[in-house]
Design a protein with these regions (language model features):
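Non-catalytic helical/linker scaffolds that mediate oligomerization, partner binding
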Residues: 1-454
Length: 454
């Protein structure tokens, strides 16, 4: 339990058939889950409503409040409906509209060519196109297994010329807002306009959601500096990145995306196959442990699991392992991951972090928008950041930021009142030195006080 309370890296878990159970969700919350994800590629509105109800009910039992993230499907191409097909590396197989592996999308046939590498189900299946005859392909698989309906299909090194958001995305976004879901993950982003469109739709629908931009295309990587400026979070979607780039490039792309996020003061999330073997096995591989550890030391704010908790056999154990690995990475390394100071307020925040370490003081950030604790977090202080806020939306938004412990107060009148409430809630003790920082005008960090808790 000490690890759960001390861990600074945040954990996001996907809810699916394996975890659509209130007791399991309660256990995951107790093990330290900071947010839950609903994948709208696989969930109907009826199923999503049930998931929201289960999470909110579990929160009351576990005495916890966490954000829910709606992960929009985005403009992607998926297989059609067909009976499962077992493929091997010895035989040729057909991809067509009416036999073999079914694909009904014009955009796929317009883009695919002989010699292309096709990637199905986020990298689980790889095939080489041997022949193309109109809307019928002959392919040879490089991997083996059973392929089922509705899996994603991509062409390595190529992007489908599809616009975002789709009609389904808009419908799902509006549903999410009505359901009180706080965050939205935007899939297959190519440029900042894709993010701005989703924000406009959310605002016109009367909702407040924080945005997570999923970077998983060639254009998304190339335009990351523009995208990150209009996003609340960025997500390194390694599955689909592996469909567009050679796999050996993924570690450096991950490092680059995390560094760009840090440089712009935006938190980052690393996802896909973190503990994939735990979908079946109760213990992760050594390579998976090293992968998660490395993501933390690179500077990721959050770790997100998908199939491991959505359909896996050991969802609660997955959270325990993530918690322990992240805690170990933080404990054994002096994580001096730092972004660049962009303006005078960033330099001010960096100075506050340095001062807190020089005088061994805890950090208290009083915030209305969440920007002050986020500014502090990017410089990775040794102390936890207590973020006092009045807004439940800001409280939940901050739960995905490294080292930030948001605290929801009924009202904020002055610094002393906040400090005394934090003491009453046992976040602070008498005699502790603290640095209280806040903004005198919205959106900036420009005021501090050094106090001793009375």
């Amino acid at each position: 339990m000490e690890n759960v309370l001390s861990r600074k890296t945040k954990i996001i878990a996907t809810i699916g058939p394996a975890t659509m159970n209130q007791n399991v969700i309660v256990e995951m919350l107790k093990e330290g889950v900071n947010a839950f994800r609903i994948n709208f590629s696989h969930s109907s509105h009826e199923q999503a409503s049930q998931i929201v109800y289960l999470i909110r009910s579990a929160e009351k039992i576990a005495n916890s409040r966490v954000p829910i993230i709606a992960d929009l499907q985005g403009p992607t191409v998926r297989l059609g409906d067909f009976n499962d097909i077992e493929v091997n590396r010895e035989n040729d197989y057909v991809i067509s509209e009416n036999e073999g592996i079914i694909v009904n999308e014009d955009v796929f046939y317009n883009l695919v060519e002989t010699g292309d590498t096709i990637i199905i189900d986020g990298g689980r299946f790889w095939a080489k196109v041997k022949e193309k005859n109109g809307r019928k392909l002959k392919v040879r698989f490089m991997t083996e297994g059973v392929i089922g309906s509705r899996k994603t299909i991509a062409i390595q090194g190529k992007e489908y010329p599809l616009k975002a958001p789709t009609e389904k995305d808009i419908s799902d976004l509006q549903f999410a807002i009505k359901s009180g879901i706080e965050g939205v993950a935007i899939s297959f982003i190519k440029n900042k306009e894709d993010v701005l469109k989703v924000k406009e739709i959310a605002e016109s629908s009367g909702g407040s959601v924080f945005t997570i931009s999923k970077i998983e295309t060639i254009s998304g990587v190339n335009n990351i500096k523009d995208i990150v400026q209009v996003s609340d979070y960025i997500l390194v979607a390694r599955g689909d990145l592996g469909s567009h780039f050679p796999l050996v490039k993924i570690p450096e792309i991950q490092r680059h995306l995390i560094e760009v996020a840090l440089d712009h003061g935006k938190p980052s999330i690393v996802a896909t196959q973190l503990l994939d073997s735990m979908t079946v096995n109760p213990i992760p591989t050594r390579a998976e442990v090293t992968d998660v550890y490395t993501a933390v030391t690179m500077g990721a704010d959050s770790l997100m699991v998908s199939g491991e908790t959505a359909v896996g056999k050991h969802p609660v154990d997955v959270i325990r392992w993530l918690n322990d690995i992240a805690f170990e990475a933080e404990r054994n390394q002096n994580l001096r991951v730092k972004g660049k100071s962009l303006d005078i307020y960033d330099k001010f925040a960096e100075g506050v972090v340095m001062m807190s370490e020089l005088i061994d003081a805890k950090l208290v950030a009083i915030t209305t928008t969440g920007k002050t604790p986020m500014r502090l977090a990017r410089f990775r202080p040794k102390s936890e950041i207590l973020a006092a806020c009045e807004s439940e939306f800001v409280f939940k938004k901050l739960q995905l930021t490294y080292g930030v412990m948001p605290v929801l107060l009924n009202s904020i009148k002055n610094d002393q009142q906040v400090v005394q409430e934090l003491k009453a809630l046992k976040f602070l003790k008498a005699g502790e030195k603290i640095i209280v920082t806040r903004s005198l005008k919205q959106g900036v960090t420009d005021a501090i006080k050094i106090l001793e808790v009375q």
